[in-house]
UniProtKB/Swiss-Prot annotation:
Residues 511-547 are cytoplasmic. The chain crosses the membrane at residues 486-510. Pfam families: ICAM1_3_5_D2 (PF21146), ICAM_N (PF03921). This is Intercellular adhesion molecule 3. Coiled coil: none annotated. It comes from Homo sapiens. PANTHER family: INTERCELLULAR ADHESION MOLECULE, INTERCELLULAR ADHESION MOLECULE 3. GO terms for molecular function: integrin binding; signaling receptor binding.
Length: 547
């Protein structure tokens, strides 16, 4: 029965010595051969191998197999023996021997073991790589044999960047790559190729997990920051921050702040340009000198811009009246005030000092009704003067009045003509104006055209009335009638025209009758007298004669 000989009991040097001792000079004169099959086999690490040793020597003794590997005699017979080698983990040489006619015959075979790498790993890439700068790809390979057939390939996508043999254990292969924009988001990996095709086994490939590279471009120039120089408390103003030449702009981070107050920015990018917009609102506790800050961060690098800003408080001006609606003759006080450090001027009269109010007093009169009082305020902020204005209007209550200049007291108009009674009343509250004829309730319209006749002749009481009292003005209307002989003359003319018309009509009728009568011609006469047969002959009228 075959015995299992652990390889740990026989160091490699001892087995080499044993093989050398077995190769005695008598071997060269041997007439018979000892065959070992298979010859020079190749198998994967950890596999098993069936080995057959045979000889044609007719008087051979027991065949032995010498190896550092675990072995087991499977079967044997005259001139042959079969062994099973298990857990073959490394390259080895096996030796079969037998005694034939007192001489030792040997045969050998070399076992080649191939092993895929246990670890193929691409070293981590930089979190961000500047475009235009070199970076190193580093691949580490542990185990794998035979090394003469093992190659390490560095890849970008499927593009080969470097191909090198794996030499050391562990093997480390590197390649230098110039970063470009096209490399942003590209996967890099490491691949090992164990080429066992010459042994008829094929090409064994093992690939590492890919690592993604992020490249960036960040210009050295700071962002352009557009912000106000001054900002009033409780007011808002837009702030813009722009940076050009940024890649990839979509992955940049923007920080906008007013002092220690972070602003809610809206970030937009177009190509390689990034723009952040926010609204800055000043608080009361921020009054004074502050800074607007814009930070753009990409690839672990930062570009920053700062602008000075002054937060100020500008209260007023506030204009007050002691009586917004005053009675005529009363005293009214007008005052104007504003915040600290503000200089106010009321109707051209400045206050004593900044922060102090300005005042004036007046006795309210009719002319003050509707009067406006103006107050201007000036505040100096960081060398600049800011101005604001405010006003207030005074209302004065006074009794009704009629303007004599626009309401003539004596009017001369002609009968049957159109005229307008131009009278105007004033007062606060605005009065009602009516013009009534004395002795009657007849009212004439005021400010409206009307047809004048002789009945409007007389004296009128024009009265303006309101809750403040009444005011009356006497207006006399003198209506001139037409000439007194006009009617008789007109009647006479009509009668004359009538008589003339009748006479002409009678003459026309008489002449027509004469033309229609009978006439007799007298022969003895050399002329033809015409004798009318009309009844006029019977009346004895004689023809007129010229004297």
């Amino acid at each position: 029965m075959a015995t299992m000989v652990p390889s740990v009991l026989w160091p490699r040097a001892c087995w080499t010595l044993l093989v050398c001792c077995l190769l005695t000079p008598g071997v060269q004169g041997q007439e018979f051969l000892l065959r070992v099959e298979p010859q020079n086999p190749v198998l994967s690490a950890g596999g098993s191998l069936f080995v057959n040793c045979s000889t044609d020597c007719p008087s051979s003794e027991k065949i032995a197999l010498e190896t550092s590997l675990s072995k087991e005699l499977v079967a044997s017979g005259m001139g042959w023996a079969a062994f099973n080698l298990s857990n073959v983990t490394g390259n080895s040489r096996i030796l079969c021997s037998v005694y034939c006619n007192g001489s030792q015959i040997t045969g050998s075979s070399n076992i080649t073991v191939y092993r895929l790498p246990e670890r193929v790993e691409l070293a981590p890439l930089p979190p961000w790589q500047p475009v235009g700068q070199n970076f190193t790809l580093r691949c580490q390979v542990e185990d794998g044999s035979p090394r003469t057939s093992l190659t390490v390939v560095l890849l970008r996508w499927e593009e080969e960047l470097s191909r090198q043999p794996a030499v050391e254990e562990p093997a480390e292969v590197t390649a230098t790559v110039l970063a470009s924009r096209d490399d942003h988001g590209a996967p890099f990996s490491c691949r090992t190729e164990l080429d066992m095709q010459p042994q008829g086994l094929g090409l064994f490939v093992n690939t590492s997990a890919p690592r993604q590279l992020r490249t960036f471009v960040l210009p050295v120039t700071p962002p352009r920051l557009v912000a106000p120089r001054f900002l009033e408390v409780e007011t808002s103003w837009p702030v813009d921050c722009t940076l050009d030449g940024l890649f990839p702009a979509s992955e940049a981070q923007v920080y906008l702040a007013l002092g220690d107050q972070m602003l809610n920015a809206t970030v937009m990018n177009h190509g390689d340009t990034l723009t952040a917009t926010a609204t800055a609102t000043a608080r009361a506790d921020q009054e004074g000198a502050r800074e607007i800050v814009c930070n753009v961060t990409l690839g672990g690098e930062r570009r920053e811009a700062r602008e000075n800003l002054t937060v100020f408080s500008f209260l007023g001006p506030i204009v007050n009246l002691s009586e917004p609606t005053a009675h005529e003759g009363s005293t009214v006080t007008v005052s104007c005030m504003a915040g600290a450090r503000v200089q106010v001027t009321l109707d051209g009269v400045p206050a004593a000092a900044p922060g102090q109010p300005a005042q004036l007093q007046l006795n309210a009169t009719e002319s003050d009704d509707g009067r406006s009082f103006f107050c201007s305020a000036t505040l100096e902020v960081d060398g600049e003067f800011l101005h604001r204005n405010s006003s207030v209007q005074l209302r004065v209550l006074y009794g009704p009045k009629i303007d004599r200049a626009t309401c003539p007291q004596h009017l001369k108009w002609k009968d049957k003509t159109r005229h307008v009674l131009q009278c105007q009343a004033r007062g606060n509250p605005y009065p009602e104006l009516r013009c009534l004829k004395e002795g009657s309730s007849r009212e004439v319209p005021v400010g409206i055209p009307f047809f004048v006749n002789v009945t409007h002749n007389g004296t009128y009481q024009c009265q303006a009335s309101s809750s403040r009292g009444k005011y009356t003005l006497v207006v006399v209307m003198d209506i001139e009638a037409g000439s007194s002989h006009f009617v008789p003359v007109f009647v006479a003319v009509l009668l004359t025209l009538g008589v003339v018309t009748i006479v002409l009509a009678l003459m026309y009728v008489f002449r027509e009758h004469q033309r229609s009568g009978s006439y007799h011609v007298r022969e003895e006469s050399t002329y033809l007298p015409l004798t009318s047969m009309q009844p006029t002959e019977a009346m004895g009228e004689e023809p007129s004669r010229a004297e």
